[in-house]
């Protein structure tokens, strides 16, 4: 039950961070491209890489993984919003932005998970 509460706590924090980051990005860049979703996915992917690598080296507790890895990062990042925003761009006929959204999210997120892992593993 302890881990369930940690996931819930981390999830509530991650959801609030995602909301605030998305609002900030809209204020800075406007709403013509989903920069907020891209940023939270890229940031969350980097942090997930760090958490994974630390977990591989047994430097973090299962409780920390529940709080941060599952809760906070699970709520911070969002595949469903990414999918919906991409579909909306397609429905608006903006194939270029839709394609850019898919390519940037997938390539940057994969790279950031790798970068996070390498950052930790190189410090061993």
From Swiss-Prot:
Parts of the chain that traverse the membrane: 4-24, 35-55, 60-80, 102-122
Residues binding Na(+), per UniProt: 74, 77
InterPro entries: FluC
Keywords for the protein's UniProt record, in alphabetical order: Cell inner membrane, Cell membrane, Ion channel, Ion transport, Membrane, Metal-binding, Sodium, Transmembrane, Transmembrane helix, Transport
Annotated protein name in UniProt: Fluoride-specific ion channel FluC
Catalytic reaction annotation: fluoride(in) = fluoride(out)
Statement: the UniProt record of this protein carries the keyword Cytoplasm: no
Family: Belongs to the fluoride channel Fluc/FEX (TC 1.A.43) family.
Regulation: Na(+) is not transported, but it plays an essential structural role and its presence is essential for fluoride channel function.
Signal sequence, start to end: none
Location, primary (coarse class): membrane
Protein species of origin: Shewanella baltica (strain OS155 / ATCC BAA-1091)
MF GO annotations: fluoride channel activity; metal ion binding
GO biological process: cellular detoxification of fluoride
Topological relation to the membrane, as annotated: Multi-pass membrane protein
Pfam families: CRCB (PF02537)
Function of the molecule: Fluoride-specific ion channel. Important for reducing fluoride concentration in the cell, thus reducing its toxicity.
């Amino acid at each position: 039950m302890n881990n369930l509460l940690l996931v819930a706590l981390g999830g509530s924090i991650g959801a609030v961070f995602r909301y605030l980051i998305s609002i900030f990005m809209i204020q800075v860049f406007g709403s013509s491209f989903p920069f907020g979703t891209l940023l939270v996915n890229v940031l969350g992917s980097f942090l997930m890489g760090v958490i994974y690598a630390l977990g591989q080296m047994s430097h973090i507790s299962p409780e920390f993984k529940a709080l941060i890895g599952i809760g906070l990062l699970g709520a911070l990042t969002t595949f469903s919003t990414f999918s919906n925003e991409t579909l909306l761009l397609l429905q608006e006929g903006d194939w270029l932005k839709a394609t850019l959204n898919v390519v940037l999210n997938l390539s940057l997120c994969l790279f950031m998970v790798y970068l996070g892992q390498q950052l930790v593993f190189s410090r061993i």
